[in-house]
Each structure stands twice: as structure tokens, then as C-alpha cells.
Amino acid sequence: MAKVRLSVPAVDDLDRMIVTHSLPADTRLRVQRSLRILEQFPRIGRQLEGRWAPMRVILGPWRWMLIIYSHEEPDDVVLIVAFQDARSSAAATAP
């Protein structure tokens, strides 16, 4: 099973989203549930292209929340690098 870790910038992203998007008090718990799948299936996310390659992305507890991560295969560690709003023109999945 892969170990899932959050980077400091990702935690900052999530904290900022909680405030700017008026997310509910249980947001961190919801995100934690969304991350569980990565323990067993670390490559489940779609691989990103361009400047975000070779990162991967899955959806968070809301369809608009992107969870950007990398999988370090030798150590079997998933590192969450960012949380983003998919509706933003600056999102990793934006055209």
C-alpha cells in the first residue's frame, strides 16, 4: 500500500480554499476520504500534460476540486502537491 503525504503548499491550498470557497467544517475529513483510493491505486489518476507532467490528478470531494499528486514508485509514496479549483483558468486541467 502506498503512503499518502501532503506537501506544505498543498495544505496551504486547502486552507485557502476552505476560506475562499466557504467550505464546510468537515472538509478535511472529506478530502481524507477522497485520498484513500490512492493508498491502493496510486496510478488511478489521469496523467497531466505540459508543465504539470508527470503529475496525476483525481477529483476531490466536490467535482470542481482537483487533487494534483505525484507517485514516487521506488518508495511507494503519493505526494499531494496541490488542490485546485477546476473552474479556474489557471487550473492544471485548463485548456
Language-model features, listed with the residues they occupy:
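Arg/Lys-rich, positively charged N-terminal/basic patches that mediate binding to nucleic acids
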Residues: 1-32
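Amphipathic alpha-helical recognition patches that constitute DNA-binding helices
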Residues: 5, 56, 79
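Short alpha-helical segments used as structural interaction elements across diverse proteins
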Residues: 25-27, 53, 84
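A short, surface-exposed loop/turn module that caps and links secondary-structure elements
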Residues: 33-60
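Enriched for short, Lys/Arg-rich terminal
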Residues: 60-95
